[in-house]
Amino acid sequence: MATVEELQTRVKQLEEELERERTRNRGGTDGGGGRKKIDQMSSEVVDSNPYSRLMALKRMGIVDNYERIRDFTVAIVGVGGVGSVTAEMLTRCGIGKLLLFDYDKVELANMNRLFFQPHQAGLSKVQAAEITLRDINPDVEFETHNYNITTVDNFQHFMDRISHGHLKGDRPVDLVLSCVDNFEARMAINTACNEQGQVWIESGVSENAVSGHIQVIKPGETACFACAPPLVVASGIDEKTLKREGVCAASLPTTMGIVAGFLVQNTLKYLLEFGSVTYYLGYNAMQDFFPSMAMKPNPNCDDSFCTKLQTEYQEKLLAQPKEEAKEETVEEVVHDANDWGIELVAETTEEELKAASHGHVPELVEGVHVAYVRPMTQEDEEGAAGLTVDDQESLEDLMAKMKSI
């Protein structure tokens, strides 16, 4: 049972939260974080500008127009270990509006993760998140929903909010981020997004807390969550029957933070159109392994909306004008006597070969050839020019002349 001091502390916290809400409802410019709302982002480098380092991305040529981030609306489903950090990162980046969905409450068991604080125990996660996030950045607009999206009534309301809850009016949100920890909620998000053709990013951390992943899902273009479901989903097993009393999944704030970082990084690249969006990125902490791939949709997917969108996407591709095939310039093979196109060049020059061909070649028996002919020197040429041979003299006469010398 709570002590008097604990109750008094709790009352004080609630009074502070109530005062923040009153200030916000009165239209005050102070968002609760001690600074006034900023109407327009500035790149001015001063200590009082919370956006100066973000706007530096423009100066460095990374993003063309970072200010556009204030025009985007993102829905985050699940405000736990990954979702709360994701919401915080997007808030610090200056996102226009966040829709937060979660039915759970903050517990002391959540303190091993990031974001939540012990004094927030007992508050709903979406309420605690909104209070903290408003203090961080009062320029962001928040919309919170404290319910389970998998029930029939709540599912319909969830679909309505992601299709009409945009910052700019009655239109769909720009992106849905799944940060839930169960397959039932993932399938609900998958169904809603397939039905509305909504792009979303799924994320998850393993039960042993040392691996995780993110997956971008564009209905009809990439594989949805039902195209290649986990074994638990494919087998039709109720997840609730797998839980045991006194047993819980492991949780590391490091893995949660890494997966949340990947999720937000991909979100920024998708919204602000810079870099390459990774359609699937995994993380294995044991080997520091980061696999990435693109997953094609399953033509036999159980979700009828997915197969319908696949057909529409293929028809759209066929309707696009075909790109003319570019003629590839084939490099001329230097030397076709080998597989590498290597040109064989002799070390002896043409002049040296020509000079060598005039040298003296001795008479050898058949089958034996000289390997090298000594080029004729100038003295050899002069001697050869002054040498005359009389073919009329016999061998005996020549020998007689030699003896007389």
UniProtKB/Swiss-Prot annotation:
The keyword Membrane applies. The active site is at residue 248. A motif (UFC1-binding sequence (UFC)) lies at residues 390-405. One of its GO terms (cellular component) is Golgi apparatus. Belongs to the ubiquitin-activating E1 family. UBA5 subfamily. It holds the Pfam family ThiF. Residues 7-24 have a biased composition (Basic and acidic residues). ATP binds at residues 81, 102, 125, 148, 182. Keywords: ATP-binding, Cytoplasm, Endoplasmic reticulum, Golgi apparatus, Membrane, Metal-binding, Nucleotide-binding, Nucleus, Ubl conjugation pathway, Zinc. Residues 1-44 are annotated as: Disordered. One of its GO terms (molecular function) is metal ion binding. Transmembrane segments: none annotated. Homodimer; homodimerization is required for UFM1 activation. Interacts (via UIS motif) with UFM1; binds UFM1 via a trans-binding mechanism in which UFM1 interacts with distinct sites in both subunits of the UBA5 homodimer. Interacts (via C-terminus) with UFC1. This is Ubiquitin-like modifier-activating enzyme 5. Residues 346-377 are annotated as: Linker. Zn(2+) binds at residues 224, 227, 301, 306. It comes from Branchiostoma floridae (Florida lancelet). E1-like enzyme which specifically catalyzes the first step in ufmylation. Activates UFM1 by first adenylating its C-terminal glycine residue with ATP, and thereafter linking this residue to the side chain of a cysteine residue in E1, yielding a UFM1-E1 thioester and free AMP. Activates UFM1 via a trans-binding mechanism, in which UFM1 interacts with distinct sites in both subunits of the UBA5 homodimer. Trans-binding also promotes stabilization of the UBA5 homodimer, and enhances ATP-binding. Transfer of UFM1 from UBA5 to the E2-like enzyme UFC1 also takes place using a trans mechanism. GO terms for biological process: protein ufmylation. The UFC1-binding sequence (UFC) motif mediates interaction with UFC1. The linker region is required to activate the active site of UFC1: it region moves next to active site of UFC1 to reduce the amount of water molecules in the vicinity of UFC1's active site and thereby elevate the nucleophilic activity of UFC1 active site. Its main location: cytoplasm. It comes from the Eukaryota. It is found in: Cytoplasm; Nucleus; Endoplasmic reticulum membrane; Golgi apparatus.
